[in-house]
Regions:
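Polybasic, glycine- and aromatic-enriched phosphate-binding surface used to engage nucleic acids
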Residues: 1-164, 168-174, 178
Length: 179
């Protein structure tokens, strides 16, 4: 995420007001989706600082920290720009990693396909081998092997069609591509 909130207290807002943009925290990631607002303090920021804003486009948000006792290390949520059409820009708190299309915008299918990968048992276990800590770093996320884009998009189509975003269903979908 781009925003270290405790270093930018003067721009934080609790309520939606003129000129604010949403500030997403890891608490907004719930059961594979990004929910906003959740009546948390400091859910908005007022800023023109480019380094604190990002385009409102499709992302996969991944929690940066997880508790040791949590069953999964990779905990992610699908962020779709179309759910927040009133904003051109958003901000993410630094305890969120975000996956985006650097060269092109990610389609809804692609974001959901990435969700299938990151929400699967295989990827969670692989990540634990790469990194034994409870911290999820972008370096390791970027180092993880992924299928080609067409396969990822097809996985996204399948999970959307099924409307079942569970780990078990993600595992079933992924098995169809990895054996």
């Amino acid at each position: 995420g781009l925003n270290v909130d405790f270093r930018n207290r003067e721009i934080l807002r609790d309520e939606a007001e003129e000129g604010v943009i949403p500030l997403f925290y890891s608490q907004h990631i719930r059961q594979g989706k990004v929910e906003f607002p959740i009546r948390k303090e400091h859910e908005y920021v007022v800023t023109e600082q480019k380094g604190l804003m990002q385009d409102n486009k499709n992302y996969l948000f991944v929690k940066h920290f997880t508790a040791k006792e949590e069953p999964r290390r990779l905990q992610c949520g699908v962020y779709l720009a179309k759910k927040f059409p009133q904003y051109q820009k958003i901000s993410t708190q630094n305890k969120i990693n975000f996956v985006d299309g650097v060269l092109t915008e990610m389609s809804e299918y692609l974001v959901y396909g990435l969700y299938v990968l990151f929400n699967s048992t295989l990827y969670d276990e692989y990540y634990r081998i790469l990194n034994g800590s409870t911290q999820v770093n972008s370096t390791e996320i970027n180092a993880m092997p992924v299928p080609d884009l067409e396969d990822i998009q097809e996985m996204g189509r399948k999970v959307l069609k099924s409307k079942d975003y569970s780990e078990a269903n993600c595992n079933l979908i992924l098995e169809g591509y990895c054996g």
